[in-house]
Regions:
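Phosphate-binding loop of NTP-binding sites
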Residues: 103-177
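N-terminal leader/targeting and accessory segments in enzymes
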Residues: 1-104
């Protein structure tokens, strides 16, 4: 029960590729099946499983992110239009967007809609993970608390965690930076 309250359950929001593209402001090519279900939205290929969607936001090399994501079974990868044209022109699974970072932001805002959890963000140069874990453990004893992903010190961690946030959570403790 402790781990369930500490990490929470995924918020059940059925998401198709077509709906995701509208949320993030992207236009799907005609050849892409907009009714395909999106399992998880990520920014890093290391976490991709079949059915996931990736937004290559520019934190990592686009060629590597797109290629590895597709190899691992991502149904689509959104990336900057210039990179799509230069590197992946012939692959319909790679979808051009004007501003990939803005796409991540729009998705996160949509994802947290309806969730009223208060947030505690832990930053600094030393002790973030320990402090986040300690505060999360203490908070989980009294409140429905979501705490950070085990590999939270990366750009994609907040995106991975926000997909676990539910309206039932009262607090969200997140390591940042």
């Amino acid at each position: 029960m402790f781990l369930k309250s500490l990490f929470g359950k995924s918020k059940e929001k059925s998401l198709t590729l077509g709906k995701l593209s509208k949320i993030i402001g992207a236009e799907l090519p005609r050849a892409v099946d907009g009714s395909a279900l999106c399992r998880t939205v990520l920014t890093q290929p290391e976490y991709v499983a079949p059915g996931d969607v990736v937004i290559s936001a520019g934190w990592y090399d686009h060629r590597r992110v797109v290629s590895q994501s597709l190899e691992k079974g991502a149904i689509a990868v959104f990336c900057p239009a210039g990179k799509k044209a230069a590197l992946f022109q012939d692959d319909d699974r790679v979808i051009a967007v004007e501003n990939a970072l803005e796409c991540v932001k729009r998705y996160e805002l949509w994802r947290e809609n309806g969730c009223k959890a208060k947030r505690i963000a832990i930053s600094g140069s030393v002790g973030k993970t320990t402090t986040t874990g300690l505060i999360g453990s203490v908070m989980a004893g009294c409140f429905r608390t979501l705490t950070h992903h085990p590999m939270a010190n990366s750009h994609g961690a907040i995106l991975r965690n926000i997909q676990k946030l539910t309206p039932a959570h009262e607090w969200w403790v997140q390591e940042v930076g």
